[in-house]
């Protein structure tokens, strides 16, 4: 079977200055980071090349770069009718983003391309960038001994999506020293990422046809390409969100804390991949005139409005032991539910060809493809220069959906154990070693014909929340000053 050998390179550097001036505390920083993904394939061929096909291919690269300059300043001002000072924080930020696609070698994309993953073609390759600037202000104060709160405003200007203003308000009321109520209301804005705007590739995907997965040459097209426009694509719009939360905190003493928080998140114009659009002969011919010989197509679109509601419960208990040893116990539980509030109108060209931009599978991946429940129990034991950490997590059941409900597959809950230990060496060094998924648990294997298995070569679902790679060992060293 084809073997994908990927190389991932992360780079980052941060520098900054901080100080005080005229009663203000200020902090300036400059941050550069990049992530590059390069893909090689082995043990595969390009059937279009026949006997001349190599068995190793370089399929190309994806690279994200980001440079951020940030300047913050804060100070306190006395207010006679408040029990505490008014804290004022202001700031400005400038950000530059760049997204690049690098072409693979010619053998990886010629004809049908290398099996398993066709390389990025020269027509896919290119670099795209944008910049945005923002200013913000945050005010916080303790109005009375029981009531405190804050408000914040942020204004941003994107070079490709114009300007927006978001806001946040929060408040906390202490009924007693041990019991308090807190709440937050905020708005959010997320411009489509550069990858969502410009990612494009032609490769082999699998689509359920007559109840079985069938390999189809599939084009993923950027929304501004002629191919996507021919299938009804429109310019992407920013996602807009509204967030609400309300919670109780109970802390009867310094060693025990419990919090219960309910939340709701509404997202308008949520960006998803369209359905894999199986093209008829007419649409195939139309895309062929634009240089794309494919049997299916997809593109990013503002597909749906969604609502996520849930509750988080977290309890922590600290046990002070002899000789300054300490044991921290944490129990956490999350329950959530996501629903689709609105579905984007189907483009006329798709309706005329009996296709749906957003199908059942696209919707149910939002609503049922992630566990609705997650429970965890963590223990941290610190003694001297040593620390031991253990975490048990239970992921709830989830369903991998298909357009035919009879092909859905539901997976049972699963428990996972992670452990790690660390030691501090001197003032600056810390060594860490650990094992994730100690008991080597795997999710249930794929049984539905509709859920990608490919004759047993891919036996586990990519939707499994704990992955499908089994036990994992790691070690790392850190130096701080």
Predicted regions and their residues:
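Outer-membrane beta-barrel transmembrane domain signature of Gram-negative proteins
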Residues: 2-14, 19, 32, 36, ...
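Extracellular loop and loop/strand-boundary signature of outer-membrane beta-barrel proteins
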Residues: 1-3, 52-61, 120-125, 152-157, ...
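Transmembrane beta-strands of outer-membrane beta-barrel proteins
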Residues: 26-30, 86-90, 149-151, 167, ...
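Short loop/turn motifs that connect adjacent beta-strands in outer-membrane beta-barrel proteins
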Residues: 20-25, 76-87, 146, 178, ...
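Outer-membrane beta-barrel signature, preferentially recognizing the C-terminal barrel domain
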Residues: 123-132, 174, 178, 191-259, ...
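Transmembrane beta-strands of outer-membrane beta-barrel pores
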Residues: 21-23, 32-38, 77, 92-100, ...
């Amino acid at each position: 079977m084809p073997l994908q050998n990927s190389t991932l390179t992360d780079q980052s550097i941060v520098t900054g200055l901080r100080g005080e001036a005229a009663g203000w505390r200020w902090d300036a920083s400059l941050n550069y980071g990049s992530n590059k993904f390069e893909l090689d394939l082995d043990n595969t061929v390009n059937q279009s090349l026949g006997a001349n096909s190599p068995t190793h291919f370089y399929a190309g690269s994806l690279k994200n770069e980001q440079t951020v300059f940030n300047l913050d300043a804060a100070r306190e001002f006395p207010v006679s009718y408040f029990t505490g000072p008014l804290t004022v924080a202001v700031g400005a930020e400038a950000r530059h983003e760049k997204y690049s696609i690098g072409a693979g070698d010619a053998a990886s994309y010629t004809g049908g391309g290398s099996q398993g993953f066709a390389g990025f073609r020269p027509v896919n390759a290119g670099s795209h960038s944008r910049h945005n600037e923002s200013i913000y202000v945050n005010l916080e104060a303790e109005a009375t001994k029981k009531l405190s709160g804050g408000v914040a405003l942020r204004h941003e200007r994107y070079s490709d999506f114009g300007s927006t203003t978001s806001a946040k308000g929060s408040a906390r009321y202490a009924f007693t020293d041990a019991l308090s109520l807190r709440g937050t209301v905020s708005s959010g804005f997320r411009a489509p990422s550069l990858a969502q705007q410009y990612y494009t590739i032609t490769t082999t995907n699998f689509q359920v046809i007559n109840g079985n997965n069938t390999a189809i040459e599939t084009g993923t097209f950027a929304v501004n390409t002629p191919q996507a426009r021919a299938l009804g694509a429109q310019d992407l719009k920013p996602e807009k969100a509204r967030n609400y939360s309300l919670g109780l905190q109970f802390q009867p003493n310094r060693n025990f804390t419990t919090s219960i928080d309910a939340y709701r998140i509404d997202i308008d114009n949520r960006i998803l991949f369209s359905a894999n659009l199986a093209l008829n002969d007419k649409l195939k011919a139309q895309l062929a005139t634009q240089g794309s010989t494919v049997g299916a197509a997809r593109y990013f679109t503002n597909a749906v409005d969604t609502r996520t509601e849930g509750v988080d419960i977290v309890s922590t208990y600290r046990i002070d032991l002899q000789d300054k040893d300490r044991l921290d116990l944490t129990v956490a539980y999350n329950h959530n539910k996501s629903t689709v509030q609105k579905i984007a109108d189907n483009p006329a060209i798709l309706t005329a060809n009996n296709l749906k931009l957003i199908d059942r599978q696209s919707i149910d991946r939002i609503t049922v493809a992630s566990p609705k429940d997650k429970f965890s129990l963590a223990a941290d034991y610190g003694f001297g220069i040593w620390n031991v950490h253990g975490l048990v997590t239970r992921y709830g059941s989830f369903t991998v959906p298909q357009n035919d409900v009879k092909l859905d597959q539901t997976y049972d809950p699963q428990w996972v154990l992670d452990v790690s230990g660390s030691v501090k060496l001197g003032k600056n060094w810390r060594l860490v070693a650990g094992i994730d998924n100690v008991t080597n648990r795997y999710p249930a294997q794929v049984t539905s014909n509709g859920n990608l298995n490919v004759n047993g070569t891919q036996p586990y679902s990519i939707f499994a929340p704990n992955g499908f790679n089994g036990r994992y060992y790691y070690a790392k060293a850190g130096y701080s000053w």
